[in-house]
């Protein structure tokens, strides 16, 4: 990517700087201290935090209308805060369902059609959950990360936050309530998921149980395929199971932003324009960073590489963006802690929803 950019822009030399950990908080400190990069990468859930604290340059006057019009709808939502564009897309990563084909084959279970329903998903998960001790295996697993959990909420058409972002809606939104009940049932009624402790015995990666052929189905993104390929894992991909006739999932967008106090915004935009434009997006796709955020990029060759790559692209049509909030980080910490109690069956779905909403009120209304 660097070589391609510098060849097209010989007057600009790029220097990539890596932040080893705590990226979002570290960059806030650097910006406050006057250590200003020309361009930054920023996850979509951090864009509101930076934008509303006056740290980002608005891009509406820099980005062409052609660029904006070519963005997938799910991407447009991730780049704007209160109607103003503050970020350009690096890539977009919708969640899809990975299936461990070795486990399916060993159990004599056929890979379902790409129109499979959530009921079919549950029945398959039950069939693939068996054994005990060292011989135990499970039908499904997801790590307790809010983006993984929200993907299942999105499948049922649910939400995390109210429209104004000042409250959570787990106890008031009917579709979200259905999703919470379903996730509770996966652990406590159907018992098709390993606990976090059981999953951890296979390794630190959230996909370690899948790669150990101990979990048969798990949500992942495009980059997950690279992880499985490197491990030699046998897998295929299907869309999110259908609920009420629709396959819906969530999507996460990685972005490029320009600090408000960047030395030369015009030069910074030239970098961002390339990285988020047709050529840069194509490079990101070729390297399996994620899907292109723009319809300007031809995905025909990518879709032809495997029988299932088309499902990544198709997911963008119905995907909803991972919800962002200025106080999202504090909310997520609380939410994940409460999810632990729900998965363990220590609280009912109704109690869980009420507890989350009660704790969310003072967090989100700040």
Please name every model-derived segment:
Residues 1-52, 65-69, 93, 111, ...:
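Conserved N-terminal structural module of periplasmic/extracytoplasmic solute-binding proteins
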Residues 44-96, 119, 236-238, 300-310:
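Hinge/lid segment of periplasmic solute-binding proteins
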Residues 60-71, 113-114, 131-134, 138-139, ...:
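Short, solvent-exposed loop/beta-turn-alpha elements that line the ligand-binding surface or hinge
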Residues 78, 235, 285-337, 341:
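Long, aromatic- and glycine/proline-rich binding clefts that accommodate carbohydrate-like moieties
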Residues 125, 166-197:
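Glycine-centered hinge/linker elements that transmit conformational signals in sensory
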Residues 215-216, 254-290:
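Bilobed periplasmic-binding protein/Venus flytrap-like ligand-binding cleft at the lobe interface
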């Amino acid at each position: 990517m660097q070589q391609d950019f510098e060849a097209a822009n010989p007057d600009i030399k790029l220097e990539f700087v890596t932040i080893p950990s705590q990226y979002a908080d570290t960059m806030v400190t650097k910006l406050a201290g006057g250590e200003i990069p020309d361009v930054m990468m920023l996850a979509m859930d951090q864009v509101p935090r930076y934008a509303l604290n006056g740290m980002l340059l608005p891009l509406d006057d820099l980005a062409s209308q052609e660029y904006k019009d070519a963005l997938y709808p799910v991407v447009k939502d991730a780049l704007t805060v209160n109607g103003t564009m503050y970020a350009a897309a690096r890539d977009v990563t919708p969640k899809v369902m990975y299936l461990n084909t070795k486990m399916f084959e060993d159990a004599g279970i056929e890979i379902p059609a790409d129109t499979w329903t959530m009921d079919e998903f549950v029945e398959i998960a039950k069939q693939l959950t068996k054994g005990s001790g060292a011989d135990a295996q499970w039908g499904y697993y997801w790590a307790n990360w809010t983006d993984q959990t929200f993907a299942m909420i999105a499948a049922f058409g649910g939400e995390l936050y109210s429209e104004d972002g000042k409250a959570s809606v787990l106890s008031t939104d009917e579709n979200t309530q259905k999703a919470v009940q379903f996730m509770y049932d996966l652990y406590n009624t159907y018992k098709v998921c390993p606990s976090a402790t059981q999953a951890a015995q296979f390794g630190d990666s959230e996909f370690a149980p899948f790669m150990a052929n101990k979990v048969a189905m798990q949500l992942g993104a495009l980059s997950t395929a690279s992880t499985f390929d490197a491990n030699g894992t046998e897998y295929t991909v299907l869309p999110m199971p259908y609920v009420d006739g629709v396959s819906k999932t969530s999507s996460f967008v990685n972005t490029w932003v320009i600090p408000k106090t960047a030395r030369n915004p015009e030069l910074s935009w030239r970098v961002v324009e390339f990285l988020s434009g047709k050529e840069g997006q194509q490079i990101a796709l070729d390297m399996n960073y994620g899907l292109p955020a723009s319809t300007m990029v031809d995905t025909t060759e990518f879709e032809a590489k495997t029988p299932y790559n088309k499902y990544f692209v198709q997911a963008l049509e119905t995907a909803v963006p991972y919800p962002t909030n200025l106080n999202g980080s504090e909310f997520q910490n609380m939410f994940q802690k409460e999810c632990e109690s729900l998965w363990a069956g220590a609280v009912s779905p109704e109690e869980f929803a009420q507890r989350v909403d009660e704790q969310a009120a003072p967090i989100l209304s700040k």
